[in-house]
């Protein structure tokens, strides 16, 4: 009989090495996912991504998504009051952002970025989200309600009220890791994103705190027609609506 002990040992050795390398690769992938998405999506989504990293397509893909922009309106009185106390001003902004962000994440949204006191969020990436338009709408309405509660707290603390404008739009865009070889972020590009930002900035013009495009409308809400707006590069105007309080 041939002595196969050496062969078995060698096979076991290489199997151990392969298993260890696979473990390290998976560990690094999970750590990278937590680092990249841990503060931008809900903990449940992070766990799902860590469990199955193949769900991610970080290289870039085209898909229908829903976008939400929210920004503080009339920030000047607050900034003027605390111009000599920048730490207090930052604290107020952070309390506002936390108040609003928790609601977005609760409804499956991803925080793309903060731009000062502005929040940009989207639905349907990095994971597919069912009823993305409805979840964005529910989030916006809950954000409105939560801000009212936060303003009551601010009032008791002598802090001026915060008012916001919010824009929601849905459409095709490109999503994935974007940036230079030294720094990149998971973000989006497309006309649908730009329109959502434009709707948010138009809230003051239409004296409302929420504008939703016709592409994001869902059943079950009492929409009030506002206007038709022409989007750069498009021949057909887009109908825009609000949902009254």
What are these regions (language model features)?
Residues 92-109, 125-166, 170, 191-204, ...:
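Alpha-helical scaffold within the catalytic cores of cyclic-nucleotide enzymes
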Residues 177-180:
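Cytochrome P450 core scaffold surrounding the K-helix E-X-X-R motif
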Residues 39-58:
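Cytosolic juxtamembrane regulatory segments of multi-pass membrane proteins
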Residues 1-40:
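Transmembrane alpha-helices and their extracellular/periplasmic helix-loop junctions
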Residues 173, 196, 202-245:
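Cytosolic regulatory/linker segments at or just downstream of nucleotide-handling modules
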Residues 56-138, 186:
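Catalytic NTP-binding/metal-coordinating core of nucleotidyl cyclase/transferase enzymes
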Residues 42, 71, 233:
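Short, conserved phosphate/pyrophosphate- and ester-handling motifs at nucleotide-, phospho-/glycolipid
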Residues 67, 119, 164-170, 240:
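A structural signal for short, well-ordered beta-strand segments
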């Amino acid at each position: 009989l041939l002595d196969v002990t050496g062969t078995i040992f060698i096979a076991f050795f290489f199997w151990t090495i392969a298993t260890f390398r696979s473990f390290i690769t998976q560990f690094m992938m999970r750590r990278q996912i937590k680092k990249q998405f841990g503060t931008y999506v809900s903990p449940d989504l992070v766990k799902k991504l860590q469990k199955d990293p193949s769900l991610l397509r970080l290289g870039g893909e085209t898909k229908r998504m829903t976008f939400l922009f929210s920004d503080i309106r009339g920030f000047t009185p607050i900034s003027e009051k605390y111009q000599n106390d920048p730490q207090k001003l930052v604290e107020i902004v952070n309390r506002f952002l936390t108040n609003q962000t928790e609601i977005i994440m609760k409804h499956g949204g991803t925080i793309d970025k903060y731009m000062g006191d502005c929040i940009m969020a989207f639905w349907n990436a990095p994971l597919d989200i069912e009823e993305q338009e409805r979840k964005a709408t529910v989030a916006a309405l809950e954000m409105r309600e939560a801000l009212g509660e936060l303003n009551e707290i601010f009032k008791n603390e002598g802090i001026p009220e915060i008012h916001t404008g919010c824009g929601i739009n849905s459409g095709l865009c490109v999503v994935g890791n974007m940036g230079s070889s030294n720094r990149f972020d998971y973000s989006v590009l497309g006309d649908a994103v730009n329109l959502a930002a434009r709707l948010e900035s138009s809230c003051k013009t239409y004296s409302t705190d929420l504008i939703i495009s016709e592409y994001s409308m869902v059943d079950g809400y009492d929409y009030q027609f506002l206007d038709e707006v022409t989007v750069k590069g498009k021949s057909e105007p887009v109908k825009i609506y609000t949902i009254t309080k």
